[in-house]
């Protein structure tokens, strides 16, 4: 009787380990775009993000003349493409877009805070947040003109 309990225990442990590794492997194979929830979820986050920026007195002046509908579309396409989705960003490059705006490091950091707040609103996981920020972060050098 004792021998069979040990076998059952070992079998359960092996099955649990196999199942866990399969789930982990499956999650790792999914693109960031898929893990974010696709274009609909990205659209929701971007809309919230733009709202956050509009309410943020530290940086909303940079956007006073922006076409918010066009900005929304470009940001959705940019995040979708950057995260491995099927969208294509067709807007201007970041250096051209921000030339002469005198964006400061503090303003850029405030923008990132507003993005993180939008991601948090939709309970985006830490891994996905970190990956998205890592993909978008290199744009800083083309956006910030005043360190």
Task: Provide a role label for each language-model segment.
Residues 6-16:
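Sec-dependent N-terminal signal peptides
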């Amino acid at each position: 009787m004792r021998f069979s309990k040990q076998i059952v225990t070992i079998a359960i442990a092996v099955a649990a380990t196999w199942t866990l590794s399969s789930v982990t492997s499956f999650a790792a194979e999914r693109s960031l775009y898929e893990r974010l929830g696709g274009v609909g979820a990205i659209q929701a986050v971007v809309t919230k993000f733009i709202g956050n920026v509009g309410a943020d007195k530290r940086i909303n002046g940079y956007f006073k003349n922006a076409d918010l509908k066009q900005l929304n579309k470009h940001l959705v396409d940019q995040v979708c493409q950057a995260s491995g989705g099927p969208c294509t960003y067709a807007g201007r490059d970041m250096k051209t877009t921000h030339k002469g705006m005198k964006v400061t490091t503090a303003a850029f950091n405030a923008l990132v805070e507003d993005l993180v707040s939008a991601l948090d609103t939709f309970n985006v996981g830490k891994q996905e947040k970190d990956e998205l920020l890592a993909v978008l972060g290199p744009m800083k050098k083309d956006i910030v003109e005043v360190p």
